[in-house]
Amino acid sequence: MVTSINEPKAVTRSDKGLRFSLWIVQAILAVWFGLAGVLHAAVPIAKLAPFAPWTADVSPALVRFIGAAELAGAVGVVLPALVRILPVLTPLAAAGLALIMTLAIPFHVSRGEPQVTPMLIVFAALGVFVAWGRSRRVPITSREVESAHRRAGSL
């Protein structure tokens, strides 16, 4: 019998713990980047600059672009997995958020703001964890794939 790569495997206890951990981290990333995205995308630069001085020193378009990317990542890290429609987007969104944080490290260090580096590393690591977990270890099966397995009698 030929098996599909997407065929469900037996769920182990460690997989359940990992799935739970991934959902918690996904929620943390969604809240954090959702808030950051709204601030960077919608709050006037003059009001944002006292709390995020870098926003006054770069193009407003860049601040808005970063905000839009953070918002897209916040939605993408949870919604596709939650509704199981194109869940492959979840690890991609997590990787994108990790990339934003990774690029922010040298930017802030070059501005003499190394104190934010630990936080940036933590959020980059959380993004990498979700990208790894949802793409390699315990990916979420899309509704379409699950329906196909049911029709084929493999579930």
Name these PLM-found stretches.
Residues 2-155:
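Membrane-interface extramembranous regions
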